[in-house]
Amino acid sequence: MSCNQDTEILMLALFQTIDLALNLYTWVLIASAIFSWLYAFNVINSRNQFVNAIGSFLVNVTEPALRPIRRILPNLGGIDISPIILLLIIFFIRSFMWNTLYPMTV
């Protein structure tokens, strides 16, 4: 194998790893939004230790990325669109990565 092929394989592995992490984080964001709706409408028991552990995990994983977006967005009266904005940002990052950055490395 040439050095160019090694670099190409390494870059592909790097891009696929980043893409997998962003895809996984997308699903965690969706799960967090659904969980918050279920919690808000009292569909799930908030005193259940397992439910509380899942909720804490989802908040701890998503809050660091959502907090800066919430600071920028205006208050919409109880409607939190920060997960939607973050999902759009992730979509654009993935699209930019595969359509612009990856072809430059090949």
Curated annotation (Swiss-Prot):
Transmembrane segments: 24-44, 73-93
Main location: membrane
Membrane topology according to the record: Multi-pass membrane protein
InterPro entries: CCB3/YggT
Pfam families, A to Z: YGGT (PF02325)
Keywords: Cell membrane, Membrane, Transmembrane, Transmembrane helix
Subcellular location: Cell membrane
CC annotations in GO: plasma membrane
PANTHER family named in the record: PROTEIN COFACTOR ASSEMBLY OF COMPLEX C SUBUNIT B CCB3, CHLOROPLASTIC-RELATED (PTHR33219:SF14), YLMG HOMOLOG PROTEIN 2, CHLOROPLASTIC (PTHR33219)
Family, similarity comment: Belongs to the YggT family.
Protein name: Uncharacterized protein Atu2659.1
